């Protein structure tokens, strides 16, 4: 006979299936089709027989645990929905007579392997679905449509931003040196911004506003690509380098933390292998961001959307012109990381006491 606990399990299983608003029914079954063992409502084909969940579980446990039953009567007990838990021997024999096959019951190792296969297949289907969605929204095949803008922005970026900044400070005062340096770098970013025609439609205060809010992140984007992945070091001014510090980050001084943040950004972007087109377009996007202005948001947003489309179209393609749908999402998640990290550095780059470190980061050479 089955234990009280087993009886409760069978009843609970039956109750759960009954409580569902629309019980799942395989296409090969008819509504109300009975279990061939006990007559309860069947749920499907289990081990080659149409059975209920209770008889399926009973048969599986019996085979897996190699349980041997004995009948207290003459081995002819009636097995029904009500009496199925009275004699386990006769219930198991009826399972066998009605086609349930012991060889189809998986052992623990086989069950784990099957569960893993199901999970892997589910993840594969999710990935295929994601790839389908990405492909549907892909702009890779529209690159020709944006080529003129891409070429224009890239050429101007290389012409202006690739010029190494060398500077001889005029003052010995830290505060004045910081002003000199800020003007120098922001002027370079301004020159690049002015090559995009929308700049001509902005008034002077709006121009200053977008440069003031973007020059640092644009320059940092450029700096972190002066990264040597082989040596894992950042190339700095006056032929110096920065190698990652050892020890606990929380125990580092303020300046070292800034360099560590730059290294982390560099490592994150290095795996993306961005080319000049992507750097140029992303820099333009960082400048012409609607969040950088209080007014003219609609005007800025128009060029912002166009630049996004240009960047997406080239970021979805490999160098060999084959499609790479996952490169764009991976690129996208790094952009807010860049913006957030640089925003946390603002105070450091506005502190005159950090002028030497700031010059080391932003300039190619200085005296």
UniProtKB/Swiss-Prot annotation:
Xref: PROSITE patterns: NR_LBD (PS51843), NUCLEAR_REC_DBD_1 (PS00031), NUCLEAR_REC_DBD_2 (PS51030)
GO (cellular component) term, any one: RNA polymerase II transcription regulator complex
Keywords on record: DNA-binding, Metal-binding, Nucleus, Receptor, Transcription, Transcription regulation, Zinc, Zinc-finger
SMART domains linked: HOLI, ZnF_C4
GO molecular function: nuclear receptor activity; RNA polymerase II cis-regulatory region sequence-specific DNA binding; zinc ion binding
DNA-binding region ranges: 32-107
Zinc finger (NR C4-type) boundaries: 35-55, 71-95
Claim: Hydrolase is one of the keywords in the record: no
Localization annotation: Nucleus
Domain of life of the native organism: Eukaryota
InterPro entries from the UniProt entry: NHR-like_dom_sf, Nucl_hrmn_rcpt_lig-bd, Nuclear_hormone_rcpt_NR1, ThyrH_rcpt, Znf_hrmn_rcpt, Znf_NHR/GATA
Single GO biological process annotation from the record: negative regulation of transcription by RNA polymerase II
SUPFAM superfamilies: Glucocorticoid receptor-like (DNA-binding domain), Nuclear receptor ligand-binding domain
Domain annotation NR LBD: ranges: 145-367
Entry similarity comment: Belongs to the nuclear hormone receptor family.
Name of this chain's protein: Nuclear hormone receptor-like 1
Source organism of this protein record: Onchocerca volvulus
């Amino acid at each position: 006979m089955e234990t009280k606990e087993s009886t409760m399990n069978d009843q609970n299983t039956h109750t759960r299936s009954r409580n569902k608003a629309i019980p799942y029914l395989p296409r090969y079954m008819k509504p109300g089709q009975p279990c061939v063992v006990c007559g309860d409502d069947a749920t499907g084909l289990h081990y080659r027989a149409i059975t209920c969940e209770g008889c399926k579980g009973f048969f599986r446990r019996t085979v897996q645990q190699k349980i041997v039953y004995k009948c207290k009567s003459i081995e002819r007990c009636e097995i029904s929905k009500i009496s199925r838990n009275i004699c386990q021997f006769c219930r198991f024999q009826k399972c066998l007579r009605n086609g349930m096959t012991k060889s189809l019951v998986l052992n623990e190792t086989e069950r784990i392997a099957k569960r893993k296969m199901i999970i892997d297949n589910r993840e594969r289907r999710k990935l295929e679905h994601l790839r389908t969605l990405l492909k549907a929204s892909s702009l890779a095949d529209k690159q020709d449509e944006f080529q003129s803008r891409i070429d224009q922005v890239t050429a101007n970026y290389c012409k202006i931003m690739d010029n190494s900044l060398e500077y001889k400070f005029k003052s010995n005062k830290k505060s004045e040196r910081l002003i000199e340096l800020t003007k120098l770098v922001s002027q370079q970013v301004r020159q690049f911004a002015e090559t995009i025609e929308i700049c001509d439609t902005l008034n002077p205060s709006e121009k200053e506003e977008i440069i003031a809010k973007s020059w640092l992140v644009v320059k940092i984007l450029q700096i972190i690509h002066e990264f040597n992945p082989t040596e894992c070091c950042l190339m700095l001014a006056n032929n110096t380098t920065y190698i990652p510090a050892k020890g606990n980050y929380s125990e580092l001084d303020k300046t070292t933390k800034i360099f560590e943040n730059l290294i982390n950004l560099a490592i994150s972007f290095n795996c993306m292998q961005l080319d000049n087109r992507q750097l140029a377009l992303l820099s333009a996007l960082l400048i012409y961001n609607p969040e950088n202005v209080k007014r003219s948001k609609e005007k800025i947003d128009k060029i912002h959307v166009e630049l996004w489309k240009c960047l997406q179209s080239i970021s979805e393609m490999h160098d060999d012109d084959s499609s790479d749908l996952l490169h764009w999402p991976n690129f996208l998640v790094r952009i807010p990381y860049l913006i957030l990290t640089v925003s946390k550095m603002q105070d450091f780059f506005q502190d005159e006491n950090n002028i030497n470190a700031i010059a080391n980061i932003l300039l190619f050479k200085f005296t």
